[in-house]
């Protein structure tokens, strides 16, 4: 089991510990990820004990706030596109704006390219950044070719992270073609946050900014070759991902990149997803404001915008 496969499996165990899925569904999802028998039982027990010790059980709605909502952010309409990839055409949702401040690559959670992630691209476009939300399952026929979220996560886990990086680099090339002479940024959530970290640590000089949300930093990651300004966003209750924050900080400091790593103390993993059980509206609104300010600083170099 590689680093990303373990992360995705432990996320299933956390969903059980937080009451989002039941034990039967957790066992089924772990089986799709190749974790069965005693290994599955042990993982569920270990993560459950850690969650209880951290006081995060059922923490998706600790303070009584609603656990999902229609977003109040008005997105620009998105269109489905395909473009050249390293092996096959890649699928994406494209949200353009007439006078872009820059262009942003959006990387989805372990649920794949769904309406929520497409809408994030639309929100970015509404804020002045043309955005492309990539489907990292393009080679498998796209997210829509799978029967459910568990199967999507299992498929993502089987793909070498290096292939995801190649596809993201192709998406940056497409962004540069569609939005020429503008700086590029990347944002990702959960699994997508981990992928943005990997893109930032892949000797990729084209990124002016990156905003990984609650994604684990890769073991041994180095920012050599990067010039990006990095805003890392974490939930304080997300102990598993928070544990990788010191490594991210050390690597950023080693390369002397501009960065900020912010933690929303009362928020959990996936707090930005307004369709999910751990949605925290206060943290999500503030995180979005911080991201837009970060991109305005690092990506937008045009003084003509109002």
Segments and roles (model prediction):
Residues 170-226:
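Primarily recognizes the serine-hydrolase "nucleophile elbow" in alpha/beta-hydrolase
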Residues 58-96:
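N-terminal cap/lid segment of alpha/beta-hydrolase-fold proteins
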Residues 1-25:
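N-terminal secretory signal peptides
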Residues 137-162, 270-275:
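Cap/lid segment of the alpha/beta-hydrolase catalytic domain
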Residues 232-234:
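Short beta-strand/loop motif that positions the catalytic acidic residue
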Residues 153-177:
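Alpha/beta-hydrolase active-site loop
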Residues 20-28, 37-59:
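N-terminal twin-arginine translocation
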Residues 101-109:
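Short beta-strand element of the alpha/beta-hydrolase
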């Amino acid at each position: 089991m590689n680093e990303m496969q373990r992360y995705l499996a432990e996320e299933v165990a956390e969903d059980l510990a937080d009451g989002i899925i039941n034990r039967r569904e957790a066992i089924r999802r772990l089986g799709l990820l190749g974790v069965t028998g005693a290994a599955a039982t042990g993982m569920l027990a270990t993560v459950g004990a850690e969650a209880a010790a951290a006081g995060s059980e059922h923490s998706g709605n600790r303070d009584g706030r609603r656990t999902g909502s229609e977003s109040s952010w008005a997105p620009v309409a998105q269109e489905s596109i395909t473009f050249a990839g390293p092996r096959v055409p890649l699928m994406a949702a494209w949200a353009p704006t007439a006078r872009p401040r820059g262009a942003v690559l959006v990387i989805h959670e372990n649920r794949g390219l769904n309406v929520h992630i497409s809408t994030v691209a639309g929100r970015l476009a509404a804020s002045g950044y043309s955005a492309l939300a990539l489907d990292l399952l393009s080679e498998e026929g796209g997210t829509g070719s799978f029967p459910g979220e568990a199967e999507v996560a299992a498929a993502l886990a089987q793909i070498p992270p290096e292939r995801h990086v190649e596809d993201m680099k192709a998406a940056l090339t497409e962004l540069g073609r569609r939005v020429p002479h503008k700086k590029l940024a990347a944002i990702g959530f959960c699994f997508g946050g981990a992928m943005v970290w990997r893109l930032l640590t892949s000797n990729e000089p084209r990124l002016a900014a990156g905003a990984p949300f609650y994604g684990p930093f890769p073991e041994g990651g180095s920012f050599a070759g990067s010039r990006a300004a990095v805003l890392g966003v974490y939930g304080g209750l997300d102990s598993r991902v928070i544990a990788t924050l010191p490594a991210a900080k050390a690597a950023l400091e080693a390369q002397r990149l501009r960065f900020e790593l912010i933690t929303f103390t009362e928020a959990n993993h996936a707090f930005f997803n307004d369709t999910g059980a751990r949605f925290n509206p206060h943290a999500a609104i503030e995180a979005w404001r911080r991201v837009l300010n970060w991109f305005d600083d690092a990506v937008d170099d045009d003084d003509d915008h109002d």
